[in-house]
Amino acid sequence: RELLIDFMNAENIPYRIEGKIVVDNDIEKIAELNKRAEDLNMSGVKALERNEILDLEPNCKFKSALYVPQAGVVDYKVVTEAIAKKFVSLGGTVEYFQKIKNINSQNDLKVLTSDKESFSSEYLINCAGLFSDTVAILDNINPNLRIIPFRGEYYVLSKQKSHLVNNMIYPISDPNLPFLGIHLTKNVDGQIEAGPNAVLAFAKEG
C-alpha cells in the first residue's frame, strides 16, 4: 500500500484517501468486524454510532458503522498505464493483442508461445485476471478452482446528486456470497457510482 502511494505521488497520479464506512443496523455485526480489525492491528479503524456516522455522511441513516481511514480511491487505469510506462522506461517490453497458447519450461526458463511469437523469461507472473486459471493450467499448475465470470453493472448519479455522498459507503458483505454488495463510491473526479449488481456472463470476454 505505501509503495503504491509513493508511486502515485512520484507519477503525479491523482487519488484520494479519505476513508470509508461499512454500515449495518446490527450493532453486534459492526462490533464483530471491529474486533477483526483490532486483531489485524489496523490502525485508526473504529466503530461509529449514529451521530458519528452523520458527521461523515449526513445522508446515511444507519445505526452503526465501521470507519476505515486507510481506504481511498484512484483511477486504476491511470495507475496501470503509468506502471507500463515505467516498465518500458526501465528496458521492459509490453506486447499487446497476443493470446498465450502454450507454456513450457526449458533450461530454467519459462517459454511462452502466443498466436504470434514466443517469449522466454526466468520468471512468469500470472496476473491474467479472469484468465488466470487458464494461464495456470497452461503452466501445468492445477489451481483447484475455476473462475466463473460475472459482470458488474453500476449506476452513475447525476452531478446534481453528487453532494449526497462524501466518500465511500459499503454494506457488510455476506460471507456466504462472493460479492461485496451494493456500495456507493465517490471517484477522484467527484462522480458517484452505485453498484455493482452481479450478472452471470456467458464468456470471460463479457
Q: Over which residues does each language-model region extend?
A:
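Flavin-dependent oxidoreductases
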Residues: I103-G206
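General beta-strand structural signal in soluble alpha/beta enzymes
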Residues: K46-E49, V94-Y96, N126, A194
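Short aromatic/hydrophobic contact patches that present stacked aromatics
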Residues: K20-V22, A65-Y67, Y154
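Alpha-helical scaffold segments in soluble metabolic enzymes
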Residues: L3, K35, A82, T134, ...
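Helical element adjacent to the flavin cofactor pocket in flavoenzyme catalytic cores
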Residues: L66-Y123, C127, F131-T134
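Dinucleotide-binding Rossmann-like beta1-alpha1 core, especially the glycine-rich loop
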Residues: R1-L56, F62, G181-I182, G190-Q191, ...
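A secondary-structure boundary/capping signal
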Residues: G19, E49, P69-Q70, Y96, ...
